UniProtKB/Swiss-Prot annotation:
Glycans are attached at N99, N127, N152, N273, N354, N371, N460, N506, N553, N565, N584. The gene is ERVK-21. ERVK-21 has a type 2 genome. The HERV-K(HML-2) family contains type 1 and type 2 genomes depending on the absence or presence of 292 nucleotides at the 5'-end of the env gene resulting in Env proteins of distinct sizes. Despite their overall retroviral envelope structure HERV-K(HML-2) type 1 envelope proteins lack a predictable signal sequence. Subgenomic RNA transcripts coding for full-length envelope proteins have been detected for both type of genomes. It comes from Homo sapiens (Human). One of its GO terms (molecular function) is structural molecule activity. Retroviral envelope proteins mediate receptor recognition and membrane fusion during early infection. Endogenous envelope proteins may have kept, lost or modified their original function during evolution. This endogenous envelope protein has lost its original fusogenic properties. This is Endogenous retrovirus group K member 21 Env polyprotein.
Amino acid sequence: MHPSEMQRKAPPRRRRHRNRAPLTHKMNKMVTSEQMKLPSTKKAEPPTWAQLKKLTQLATKYLENTKVTQTPESMLLAALMIVSMVVSLPMPAGAAAANYTNWAYVPFPPLIRAVTWMDNPIEVYVNDSVWVHGPIDDRCPAKPEEEGMMINISIGYHYPPICLGRAPGCLMPAVQNWLVEVPTVSPISRFTYNMVSGMSLRPRVNYLQDFSYQRSLKFRPKGKPCPKEIPKESKNTEVLVWEECVANSVVILQNNEFGTIIDWAPRGQFYHNCSGQTQSCPSAQVSPAVDSDLTESLDKHKHKKLQSFYPWEWGEKGISTPRPKIISPVSGPEHPELWRLTVASHHIRIWSGNQTLETRDRKPFYTVDLNSSLTVPLQSCVKPPYMLVVGNIVIKPDSQTITCENCRLLTCIDSTFNWQHRILLVRAREGVWIPVSMDRPWEASPSIHILTEVLKGVLNRSKRFIFTLIAVIMGLIAVTAMAAVAGVALHSFVQSVNFVNDWQKNSTRLWNSQSSIDQKLANQINDLRQTVIWMGDRLMSLEHRFQLQCDWNTSDFCITPQIYNESEHHWDMVRRHLQGREDNLTLDISKLKEQIFEASKAHLNLVPGTEAIAGVADGLANLNPVTWVKTIGSTTIINLILILVCLFCLLLVCRCTQQLRRDSDHRERAMMTMVVLSKRKGGNVGKSKRDQIVTVSV
């Protein structure tokens, strides 16, 4: 057949099978059945919020690395790819039965602790800075619907806690007066006064009975001494000018088994000036009855009159707020913010009056007459992470615990407060150390976990190393690359880890919701100051996280490589730590932190996955065929036979290669001859037989 005819001939058509059924008919015959479940099949827990958040971050990172536009469709596909990769990993046999317990650091758990006298002063905001000294904020409470939530507490303490109210271990309330002098306009008046009365802290005695004078001076703060004259009223008669000063004598607010608390602020009161008097002069100070109802002197008594044959003097002059501090058993900082909570528990009363001089029985007679027709309601508030626990608070110094049943959680105190209750200052815990259990060993990298699990299943099989090794190498490239993106598994069957995750997640959402700052007033110094306090706690938590090496399957808290040793830290010690009782556990927790930091540092110094890679390398060594040859060829004769067999195979391959080359040359020559013949006009007509033979043989 001529070559041109071969090119023009169409290829044969396929024979159509007449008995082939339509696809729709076959689809109708398909039956879908439920996936078979083994007795060991477990129901997967739904993904947590932290896992979904981590999945979104991983999908975003994967799209950025692949330079794919971030659309909802691409995000969904990337997330599904990560999920399919993670859930397809083989689960080793017996993993569910294994139990690994490690120490975990949980930042900002849903726990509170008492604010102690050793803590720094907290920020207490007032709604009226005209009459009360301090930062102002009239937007509190931030969430009125959450004020007064009921709570039962049982927490521990190491240093004495700060408590206000009529109970052992709490500072007692009392009424305090501040006096200023105004210009006198009446000819019979010696002095004209304006006085402010409000709730304050009750002094036990006016001096430390069991302290010498030299020892009391040891705790005298550095500051401006109080003036020797009564402060003059400012130009603005509606503003009370507060000026911090240090009085000449100290008062003791508490001196018992809970500690000794003193105050160097002035305590102004009227007393008789007996200087230059020849007759007996009562020098006792005139003060309200502290055992009576505290609110009675501020509500019912709107007129005060003091009369005497001796001049009235105002002792401890100065307009300064109380600043209590603890000096025994430890020495702590001053806490001026406590007075702002106390003074807001009832309205303050504004007085005006004068001191007149008359003559009775030919003797000078002095009268102080004060009247009041103005009261000012106040409100004081704290902001998260601080709160106020109000109720029947009981402090037990023997066990160092604080209990309160059916108490209320508040952030603000106003004039409706009932002093039959007590106030305990609390704050959110920065972090706790607890042991958690897992169903696998602690691992720092997800890629090492995936590599170990895949190769563990391969190495447990027989020595089908040729094709298996190729498949494993091809798979490891994709698995390792994807594991760097996945970062964390989406499902975990460890109940304790899930419990801690939910426990900490809810508290984080709670504190974050309470700590939100109004963006419209973010430039105010008070918000900035509170934000700095909150960010300081966050930085402390981040500092711990940077120093720790955490397990790869947790994101909201950190599971450390330190294994929990029950004999060294029994559960009762952990429980006391959760309650905040740090009596005998403080040194243990400090030692535990050092051990955990050392373990994390050791893991950071090593290449991630060094132990796993070493184990995999030992397993892959068994797949080396040279080791098989060594086990088979233990004698020289067998090794020689193997070499001869290899040489024979090599010779056979060479001969086959040469034969294939000859056949290829013959085919090329034949094709060249056919091409020459097809191009000649007239073919072989007119040529001799010899020429034809020569032409064909070319």
